[in-house]
Amino acid sequence: MRYLPCLLLWAFLQVWGQSEVQQKNYTFRCLQTSSFANISWSRTDSLILLGDLQTHRWSNDSATISFTKPWSQGKLSNQQWEKLQHMFQVYRVSFTRDIQELVKMMSPKEDYPIEIQLSTGCEMYPGNASESFFHVAFQGKYAVRFRGTSWQRVLGAPSWLDLPIKVLNADQGTSATVQTLLNDTWPQFARGLLEAGKSDLEKQEKPVAWLSSVPSSAHGHLQLVCHVSGFYPKPVWVMWMRGDQEQQGTHRGDFLPNADETWYLQATLDVEAGEEAGLACRVKHSSLGGQDIILYWDARQAPVGLIVFIVLIMLVVVGAVVYYIWRRRSAYQDIR
């Protein structure tokens, strides 16, 4: 059987020695999305992530895997990388053909269009410990996993998957290859990348935060928005506060990537108009060294009041000058 991604990666076992001991957890993920519109049209795109950083990209329209980092080759020589890439190329052609055969076998229970996602890799822990995973989603829903020595249908997945899973598990060669992939290949390849990309992975970028407001969908309410951008790594804590009290109505949106591989996040709070006084947005991030960012909503309003005050003072001064000039001219005319 050739259903599985990266089956020939067992050859990697000859490549690496021991890497430096890491100080934090990282996730290494190989992601694949395959779409089959019909028996004659399909598309497969893949990428590899180490932590939050993308290290490789493979478009359906490209015959070769693209590096997205200078260190994406890890500890592999050029020859070793070319050999690996060829294995991936053989795999992609085989995967497409095997899925088409699977659809024929399962028809009419399942038919086109079909969407399949694969996620495989490992969680890496300090001390060279790791835990690998291999998950498969069908039509956008988690359906199959590889655990121990066999493939398993997950709870809630359609029962018709039992047949292809039985076929897969009967192929002892494939099962052994997947075990090698998960137990040896992924952890060693990932640690080679970790060592090569250490400086990028350990960088710290401080967040920038600012406040704004938008009309709320609720009548008489205002939605306060705390924007946080430009931070790396991804974990961040953002909360609306009143004094020391966290505002449980705080809603945090999705993390959005910036072009420079930093992140953006916003936290909103819906309040009654006039109740925003005394609120503040608090931001915690590893790059801040414990010096949290605290933005007070009242302080945001201060510049507006200050501007109004300055304008009023200027009007008074201008008025006084005009009055002084007018009095001087009047006095001069009286003398004449």
Swiss-Prot record:
Side Extracellular, residues: 22-305
Membrane topology: Single-pass type I membrane protein
InterPro entries in alphabetical order: Ig-like_dom, Ig-like_dom_sf, Ig-like_fold, Ig_C1-set, MHC_class-I_related, MHC_I-like_Ag-recog, MHC_I-like_Ag-recog_sf, MHC_I/II-like_Ag-recog
Main location: membrane
A Gene Ontology BP annotation from the UniProt entry: positive regulation of NK T cell activation
Binding residues for a D-galactosylceramide: 98, 171-174
Ig-like domain: residues covered: 207-297
Cleavable signal peptide: 1-17
Chain span(s) of sequence motif Internalization signal: 332-335
Tissue: Expressed on cortical thymocytes, on certain T-cell leukemias, and in various other tissues.
This protein's UniProt keywords: Cell membrane, Disulfide bond, Endosome, Glycoprotein, Immunity, Immunoglobulin domain, Innate immunity, Lysosome, Membrane, Signal, Transmembrane, Transmembrane helix
Cysteine pairings via disulfide bonds: 226-281
Described purpose of this protein according to its UniProt entry: Antigen-presenting protein that binds self and non-self glycolipids and presents them to T-cell receptors on natural killer T-cells.
Miscellaneous section: During protein synthesis and maturation, CD1 family members bind endogenous lipids that are replaced by lipid or glycolipid antigens when the proteins are internalized and pass through endosomes, before trafficking back to the cell surface.
Subunit structure: Heterodimer with B2M (beta-2-microglobulin). Interacts with MHC II and CD74.
This protein's name: Antigen-presenting glycoprotein CD1d2
Record organism: Mus musculus (Mouse)
